[in-house]
């Protein structure tokens, strides 16, 4: 399905590798495994914005003139269901957000964290900017259309606006 586009690895001067659930040097492990080494490899972890962040950083490095060629890639191995704490041997960086969210909107043990984070953000966007629920539904529909083209995406079922609007809203 995926094929190499003929880029000679010798041209790559920096790599930006996005993932969330891998351990600290998963980018190096992935790139060394395909023979790409001897360059700076930056591991990027920005939760749901990880892929976009890796691409932005690679683009920024090229645009700045620091380098001529960068590679951005991402990978993740997720399991079905709600996101969970994977590394219990260290503090979870989301705890500050969790504490703040809990003080602002409360916390419902029966609803996954991510749904409450994004649901709360959606509610605040609606309040501050007057965004309609229909507009947010259209965003979900567009995301599902793109995800449906990736057989490895965890949520790869295309959904309609009517389906999205028929779901329960998270208001805490």
What are these regions (language model features)?
Residues 4, 16-17:
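Short secondary-structure capping/turn segments at boundaries of alpha-helices and beta-strands
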Residues 8-14, 38-40, 134-135:
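Short acidic capping loops at alpha-helix termini that bridge into adjacent secondary structure
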Residues 17-71, 77-117, 154-169:
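Conserved catalytic cysteine-centered active-site region
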Residues 18, 73, 139-143:
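Short acidic/histidine-centered micro-motifs embedded in hydrophobic/aromatic stretches
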Residues 108-160:
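N-terminal leader/propeptide and maturation segments of large enzyme subunits in energy/redox metabolism
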């Amino acid at each position: 399905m995926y094929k190499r586009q003929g880029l000679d690895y010798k041209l790559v001067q920096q790599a930006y590798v996005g993932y969330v659930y891998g351990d600290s040097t998963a980018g190096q492990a992935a790139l060394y495994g395909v023979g790409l080494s001897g360059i700076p490899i930056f591991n990027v972890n920005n939760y749901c914005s990880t892929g976009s962040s890796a691409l932005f950083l690679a683009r920024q490095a090229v645009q700045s003139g620091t380098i001529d060629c960068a590679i951005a890639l991402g990978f993740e191995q997720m399991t079905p269901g709600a996101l969970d704490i994977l590394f219990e041997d260290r503090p979870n960086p989301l705890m500050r957000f969790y504490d703040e969210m809990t003080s602002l909107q409360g916390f419902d043990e029966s609803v996954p964290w991510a749904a409450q984070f994004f649901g709360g953000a959606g509610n605040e966007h609606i309040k501050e900017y007057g965004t309609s629920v229909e507009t947010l539904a259209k965003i979900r529909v567009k995301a599902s259309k793109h995800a449906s083209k990736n057989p490895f995406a965890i949520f790869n079922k295309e959904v309609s606006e009517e389906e999205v609007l028929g779901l329960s809203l998270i208001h805490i």
